[in-house]
Each structure stands twice: as structure tokens, then as C-alpha cells.
Amino acid sequence: MKVLLLGGTRDAINIAHSLLALNESGGQRIALIYSIAGIVRQPTINCAIHTGGFSQFSTGTASNPSQQGMKQFIQHNNIDKVVDATHPYAITISTNASTVCERLDIPFLKYVRPPWLVTDKDHWINVNNWAEAKKAMHPFKRPFVTIGRIANQDINAIPEHQFWTLRSAIEESQIQDQYSLIKAVGPFAEEQEIKLLQTHHIDVVVCKNSGGSAVDGKLSAARKLNLPVIMLNRPETDRAYGNHYDNEHDLIRAIR
């Protein structure tokens, strides 16, 4: 059986190792292709690795090159099943994969990482999109923004009364005096996050509900420092796919 695993997360790495371990148990052999955008870091997995997305395989003038390229890739590599373990906010790749699998009549299995849940010790301000997040940020002066890539136009439009601390990959900006960029890859321990929040005089944390079984360092740090958190809610498509699993063991059993 040939499986295409859409990755780029720690969950995907764990799933890949679990699938490869099945080959040593004497069951059905799995030929795994691990796909990653390749923006941040390359995984160390003993299987074929595809990097750079799928639009490179698109031909002609397709309206959706990524989707057409993925279809070409799946057909060319004789993929039997597609497993999506991308980030919960990676809507485009998940939608493309689900659509392609439906058209090719092959199984599509989606891993949905459990979201973080607010506690009575947290002060979350829930928002549905980036526009709402920016509006919620307005009363604060020193937000810590950890939502991923920030558009150049947003960096150039930081309100005069604010100084942003960013931990993300951003485009170049002509304005350099209203933000500081921290280039680092997690996970981050609570002690690290407390030190960062205090050093940069942060008064609000802005993040996505990426979720996971582990307690997030920045959320526990914000809780201890009594800081509010502007939480960008999960996309509505989070559980819109037919075969979705929030437990890795159930997912592995379904793939087998």
C-alpha cells in the first residue's frame, strides 16, 4: 500500500514513524511518501520525502495549479491513500487534498489535533479572523504575535501607539522601529516564555488555537503572568472532512 502523508507538524512526524513501524510488524507493507512545504525545517524520516508543494506538477493554465499538481502527483505515484496531518489552519492544502481524493475515489484521512481549552484561570479573547484580532489588539501597547506569517501591509500599518514582538516568518518591511522579530522554532518551555514576555514587556499574547496534547508554553506563561490572550479560533472547516480523527492510534488503525 502506498500512502501520501501531508506533513509539516510534529504530529505528522509521529504518524510517519508509526506507519513505518508497521513494516517491521509483519503486516501489510506501507510505502510512505512524506510531503512538506520545506519552509522551516526538513524532517529526518526513513522514507521518500517530497518538498516544495504540488503546483510544480501542474500543466497548462489550471485555475488551481496546486490542486491539479497534487492530482498529477497522486496518479503518477500510484497513491492508495492520502493522510492529512498538516496544521489545523492549513485550510488550502486540506481542501485541495480532500477534493482531489474525492475525484480520484481514493481514501482521504484527516488528523485533527485536539484544540486547547480555556480554563477558569485564563483570560481569552476569542476572535474568528485576523481582522478581528487586530481590532482586539488595539487597546494594548506591546502585543506578542505568534500566528505565523504576517503580511507586509500589516507590518507597515502597525498603530503608532504599539510595538509588536513577532515570532514568525515575515516579509521584508520598510518600517523597522515598531516591531522586533524573533526567529525561533518551538516547542518552547514555560520558563522560556515567561522570560520572553517579561523581557519584552508584553501586555497581550496573540496566537492561534493550534492545540495538541502538550500544554503550550506561552499560554501557561500568560496564565501565570495574568496576561490576556487573543485567541484566533479554528477554521470552520476543521472537522468538515468525512474521515477525521483526533487520536493518532485510531488514525493508524484506519490506515491499516
Task: Tell me the role of every PLM-derived stretch.
Residues 78-81, 142, 203-204:
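Structural motif
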Residues 83-84, 145, 207:
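Redox-cofactor binding/interface segments in oxidoreductases and associated redox assembly factors
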Residues 49-64, 123-131, 242-251:
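Short acidic-hydrophobic, aromatic-tinged amphipathic segments that line or gate anion-handling sites
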Residues 177-225, 230-234:
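A C-terminal functional module that forms or caps the active site or interfaces directly
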Residues 26-28, 77, 104, 225:
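Helix C-cap/helix->beta junction micro-motif
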Residues 1-36, 106, 110-183, 249-256:
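Non-catalytic interface/targeting segments
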Residues 66-130:
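Glycine/small-residue-rich loop that forms an oxyanion/phosphate-binding "nest" at active or ligand-binding sites
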Residues 47-74, 183-192:
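Glycine-rich, highly charged phosphate/nucleotide-binding loops
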